[in-house]
């Protein structure tokens, strides 16, 4: 089973507003960047999309260490998801889970992999987190119709 390191981030200019997501996949000394965006989104949706797209890109089962600066994503997948599934996608307070379609897609994308979900503090000097932050922000800027920066 291949060991893959993944770094993800999402960005939104306003919440909701133009959004971008990015992922960096690293395997055996090689890197692949993924990025995309939506004209109207939220930061949480973009964080979810970054993880989803990274996992869906992998064509075979992998051992993954996935770094995210989103507690929403990390806690959602590692702590809250079992209860949501048990309660038919309702929160502990019986409300519908927000972004359900993305959570279901993420849940499906995790099934063939072994994933260690790691939280990294955003905007704190981690070079890989900073890299995906710039990529995601540039996608959000492009969705707004602006010029991206490096």
From Swiss-Prot:
One of the GO BP terms on file: DNA replication, removal of RNA primer
Keywords: Cytoplasm, Endonuclease, Hydrolase, Magnesium, Metal-binding, Nuclease
Keyword DNA-binding listed: no
Pfam family, one: RNase_H
Residues covered by the RNase H type-1 domain: 1-141
Major place of residence: cytoplasm
Transmembrane segments: none
List of residues binding Mg(2+) 2: 9, 133
One GO CC term, this protein: cytoplasm
Quaternary structure and interacting proteins, as annotated: Monomer.
Name the record gives this protein: Ribonuclease H
């Amino acid at each position: 089973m291949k060991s893959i390191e993944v770094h993800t981030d999402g960005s939104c200019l306003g919440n909701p507003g133009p959004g971008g997501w990015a992922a960096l996949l690293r395997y055996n000394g090689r890197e692949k960047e993924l990025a995309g965006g939506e004209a109207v989104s939220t930061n949480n949706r973009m964080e979810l999309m970054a993880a989803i797209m990274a996992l869906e890109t992998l064509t075979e089962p992998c051992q993954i260490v996935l770094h995210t600066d989103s507690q929403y994503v990390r806690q959602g997948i590692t702590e809250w998801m079992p209860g949501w599934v048990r309660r038919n996608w309702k929160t502990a307070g019986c409300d519908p889970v927000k972004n359900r379609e993305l959570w279901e897609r993420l849940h499906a994308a995790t099934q063939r992999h072994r994933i260690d979900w790691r939280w990294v503090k955003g905007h704190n000097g981690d070079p890989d987190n900073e890299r995906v932050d710039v990529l995601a922000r540039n996608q959000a800027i492009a969705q707004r119709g602006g010029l991206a920066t490096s």
